Every structure is written in structure tokens, then in C-alpha cells.
């Protein structure tokens, strides 16, 4: 935040970046009870992309609707206590789009987009297929539909950042126990190849990986065993962007000092102003 005193003295002039946070909350009420909102206030983020809010409009509290310094927009699942995405933002967007335009996906509350000038920011929650064949087949349908959407979005010429829980670990480096998970949803060859296609054929960029090539960088840990304690995790949360805005990314972090969810917040700073 740039503060001006009597219109002449400016403090914090060095702050000229955009901070973008993506976090799967595994229930916004649960995250609230674990201290998420005091932490969020301290981040001074420009935009926050939420997934798996698991809430209905009438259940939103004042702090959920307007955390200090932020406004909000939400997209809800029809089914109560399930899925749902949202956005927090300092600057009012020019436009908000709730849903991607395909009923099968939109009834589950998996997509919301905010446009700021020539930049679009999406909060995305791709389905998990881990419960069985029915959901895995639905996941493939969503990937097929979303791929077409991504292709059209690229053609539009707009800059785009898609933040969210993609429910896919791309490469062996992106999960601890990759050998034992090659036949499991989230690390299936078809899912991984789909992500590769987005990067190599369509030119989208995995922003975190451009900044941090190191192993053991995870954003989700199973609640079974001592996965969190031992850092036996998966990198399922991404900020995927068009090349122009991706090139402006300057710093990344995965916040693990506190635990608000089974996912950790993914924070990336971009050398631009919203």
C-alpha cells in the first residue's frame, strides 16, 4: 500500500508488486477457526483465490465477506457443504464471471474469474477422481472442457493467471511417493500428459516451477499417518499463467508455519501493479 502524507511525502514507494495468493481452505469456516483471517490480513495480498469454501451464501460471516481491506466474490456449489470457489481483492474488478458456462461443472462451483484491465485472474478447483471411476471419468470430462477454454483464452490475447487446486501432480518431483502413486488419481499418466500439453503446446507457464526448481515443495498433505510432519506431500496447487505475466513473477513461497487446511497457501509476487 502506498501511503501519502499531506500529499507530499510518500512512504513505502518501493512496494510496486502484485501479491497473488491461492489456497484450498478445505472449508472456509474451518480455516477461519484455525486463524486464517488474521494471517491473511498480514499478507497484504492484492488478490486471493479460494477453493473448496464449502459454504452457502447465507452462512458467510462479515469477516468472510469483507476481510480487512478486501472485498469478495463467491461461486457456490448447489450441494451444501461441498466445493465452491471465491476471490478476495483490494481493487474492484472491471468484471466478475461466476462459472465457466458449462452446467455440469458450474453446479459444483469450480470456477470464478475477475478481470482487471487486460489481466484475468481465475480461481479454479478441478475435481478429484480419488473416490472412484465415476468421479475420475468426470474429471477427464472437465479436463477436456477446460482445455478448450484455455485454448480460447490464449487466443483472446489477454494475460491470464489461473490459481487453484488442479488435483494433479505434474512430475515425479511434485510428490514424495511418486513410485507408489503411478496408478492413483492425481498422478495418472493421462492427467500428467494433459498438464504437459498445456505447457508445451499452448505455452502456459507453471509459475512456481519457473521460480523454484527444488524438490520437496508440496502444497497438500494427507491427514493419514504423519504426512504433514514428515513432509510427505503433493504439489497440487498452481498458478498457471500466460507467458507475459508469468515473466513478471519475482518471488514465491508456500506458507507452512501454520496449518489452516490440508493445503498450504501458495504465494507469488509479480513485478506489476493491478
Which residue ranges define each predicted feature?
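N-terminal, active-site-proximal structural segment of metallo-dependent hydrolase catalytic domains
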Residues: 2-67, 77, 82-85, 198, ...
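Conserved beta strand-loop-helix elements of the APE1-like EEP
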Residues: 80-96, 215, 225-247
Amino acid at each position: 500500500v502506498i501511503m501519502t502524507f499531506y500529499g507530499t511525502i510518500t512512504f513505502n514507494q518501493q512496494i510496486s508488486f502484485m501479491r497473488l495468493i491461492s489456497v484450498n481452505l478445505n472449508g472456509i469456516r474451518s480455516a477461519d477457526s484455525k486463524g486464517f483471517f488474521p494471517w491473511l490480513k498480514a499478507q497484504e495480498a492484492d488478490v486471493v483465490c479460494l477453493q473448496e469454501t464449502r459454504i452457502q451464501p447465507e452462512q458467510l460471516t462479515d469477516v468472510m465477506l469483507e476481510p480487512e481491506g478486501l472485498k469478495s466474490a463467491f461461486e457456490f456449489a448447489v450441494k451444501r457443504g461441498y466445493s465452491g470457489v471465491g476471490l478476495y481483492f483490494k481493487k474492484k474488478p472491471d468484471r466478475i464471471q461466476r462459472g465457466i458456462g458449462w452446467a455440469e461443472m458450474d453446479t459444483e462451483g469450480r470456477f470464478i474469474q475477475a478481470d482487471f484491465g487486460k489481466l484475468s485472474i481465475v480461481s479454479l478447483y478441478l475435481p478429484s477422481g480419488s473416490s472412484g471411476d465415476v468421479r475420475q471419468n468426470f474429471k477427464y470430462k472437465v479436463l477436456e472442457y477446460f482445455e478448450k477454454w484455455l485454448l480460447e483464452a490464449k487466443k483472446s490475447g489477454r494475460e491470464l493467471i489461473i490459481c487453484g487446486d488442479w488435483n494433479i501432480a505434474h512430475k515425479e518431483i511434485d510428490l514424495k511417493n511418486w513410485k507408489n502413486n503411478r496408478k492413483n488419481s492425481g498422478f495418472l499418466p493421462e492427467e500428467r500428459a494433459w498438464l504437459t500439453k498445456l505447457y508445451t503446446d499452448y505455452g502456459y507457464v507453471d509459475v512456481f516451477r519457473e521460480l523454484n526448481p527444488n524438490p520437496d515443495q508440496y502444497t497438500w498433505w494427507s491427514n493419514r499417518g504423519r504426512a504433514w510432519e514428515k513432509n510427505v506431500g503433493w504439489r497440487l496447487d498452481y498458478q498457471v499463467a500466460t507467458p507475459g505475466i508469468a515473466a513478471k513473477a519475482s518471488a514465491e513461497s508456500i506458507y507452512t508455519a501454520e496449518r489452516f487446511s490440508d493445503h498450504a497457501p501458495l504465494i507469488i509476487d509479480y513485478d506489476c501493479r493491478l
